[in-house]
Amino acid sequence: MSVSALSSTRLPGSFSGFLQAAALLGLLLLLLKAAQLYLRRQWLLRALQQFPCPPSHWLLGHSREFPIDSELQQVLKRVEKFPSACPRWLWGSELFLICYDPDYMKTILGRSDPKARVSYSFLAPWIGYGLLLLEGQTWFQHRRMLTPAFHYDILKPYVGLMVDSVQVMLDKLEKLARKDAPLEIYEHVSLMTLETIMKCAFSHQGSVQLESRTSKSYIQAVRELSDLALQRVRNVFHQSDFLYRLSPEGRLSHRACQLAHEHTDRVIQQRKAQLQQEGELEKVRRKRRLDFLDVLLFAKMENGSSLSDQDLRAEVDTFMFEGHDTTASGISWIFYALATHPEHQHRCREEIQGLLGDGASITWEHLDKMPYTTMCIKEALRLYPPVPGVGSKLSSPVTFPDGRSLPKGIIITLSIYGLHHNPKVWPNPEVFDPSRFAPGSARHSHAFLPFSGGSRNCIGKQFAMNELKVAVALTLVRFELLPDPTRVPIPITRLVLKSKNGIHLRLRKLH
């Protein structure tokens, strides 16, 4: 018999042996991974033994108790039953501690822990490593670089731009309101806040609301990316970037990222083209203060280098999203709160009419002269905080004021929604009571956190408050807001606070 014939008869046996070896290796790796997950679960159980929680499934965690669209309601049940904080198991080997006590908030926000990778890193393909995702010295450099873009001298002329954008929205709503049918207002408010941020921070010319096709595509992309990010956090099989890219959700996320980036790239290129026009560059350089995008374009890092294109777009993507979606959430929920509490709406309207007189528009000087309206805005932000929660990962052990402690490596979620609805912090928390924010009223320094707190609080919080006041004031002097009793909004958590079924209101023209 030839050698080749002998070799061919042995090949099946050799291949079978290879398969057996591969199967054994795979089984060994699987057992090692299972042992690793088991040991991590045991470590987490010991680390969190001071923090009781409802029983969890060894594999599914608390996922069955936290359906994606009733998550906030489940958090409130924990707030009532477990003091200060409660663990939530995402799955068998991953959990985070939900905190909703002001002392716990103060402790965590006073630290410099990094963001929790299990949630925030999933945003990187979309918004890049801008101010939201950066850590350490690089974050500090970017924060210091961008702070001048929110100086008093910059914010003051923005009020006129805010007024223009709100008036365009109200003109559109007036035409739609003639049909005397309830309107879903969130999309209209989103287009208005997107136009505002593009005019104020990115030197955009024209009206996003009137030329809204591409802007609607961007807003739709933001909505999809927000939904997909939350779904990914909750799916153990989507933690791997490789597996996620292969999934239908991963492909949808990639396409939505492309749409969002096309929008921000267009904004950057338009501003660069404007700066090439004769005299424009010198005009900008003579400004005492630069707006947000110009700060980025003219920025010099500490080593003398300009901001890279990648870093520039990350900051633009971050602020384009945060600068419009959070304020859209805030304004929409404020409108709903006032619609369902007509006595407070009426008192706000009287205050604003007394301030503005007949036909006058709102200016910078008016913003600090509407105390009751400001109280109502803050109470609505308490009930409906635009950002329901923020997360971090402990970089060192921590001991809380009640004596309980945690080791390094635990993920912390600060539930701002839970804090704002905590009856031990806010008596009768579901009651809309603007007097909580009356001048001179006392409360814990970390009981009210609509813009987070600590060194990483919202850099644009004053910009946002100004926009909320302008939108509320101009809307109330033009319309009476009425609820749609057949469609009560259901708060759900995405990246910002949304409504599962939209926010529907009837607008009745005044005069």
UniProtKB/Swiss-Prot annotation:
Heme binds at E322, C458. Belongs to the cytochrome P450 family. The keyword Metal-binding applies. GO terms for cellular component: endoplasmic reticulum membrane. It is a peripheral membrane protein. Induction: P450 can be induced to high levels in liver and other tissues by various foreign compounds, including drugs, pesticides, and carcinogens. The lineage of its organism: Eukaryota, Metazoa, Chordata, Craniata, Vertebrata. The gene is CYP4A7. InterPro entries: Cyt_P450, Cyt_P450_CS, Cyt_P450_E_grp-I, Cyt_P450_sf, Cytochrome_P450_Monoox. Its cofactor is heme. Keywords: Endoplasmic reticulum, Heme, Iron, Membrane, Metal-binding, Microsome, Monooxygenase, NADP, Oxidoreductase. CDD domains: CYP4B-like. The keyword Glycoprotein does not apply. Coiled coil: none annotated. One of its GO terms (molecular function) is long-chain fatty acid omega-hydroxylase activity. It comes from Oryctolagus cuniculus. This is Cytochrome P450 4A7. Residues 1-4 form a propeptide. It catalyses: an omega-methyl-long-chain fatty acid + reduced [NADPH--hemoprotein reductase] + O2 = an omega-hydroxy-long-chain fatty acid + oxidized [NADPH--hemoprotein reductase] + H2O + H(+). Cytochromes P450 are a group of heme-thiolate monooxygenases. In liver microsomes, this enzyme is involved in an NADPH-dependent electron transport pathway. It oxidizes a variety of structurally unrelated compounds, including steroids, fatty acids, and xenobiotics. The kidney P-450 system is rather specialized for the omega-hydroxylation of fatty acids. Both P450-KA1 and P450-KA2 catalyze the omega- and (omega-1)-hydroxylation of various fatty acids with no drug-metabolizing activity, and hydroxylate prostaglandin A1 and A2 solely at the omega-position. Liver, kidney, small intestine. It holds the Pfam family p450. SUPFAM superfamilies: Cytochrome P450. It is an enzyme of class 1 (oxidoreductase). GO terms for biological process: lipid metabolic process. It is found in: Endoplasmic reticulum membrane; Microsome membrane.
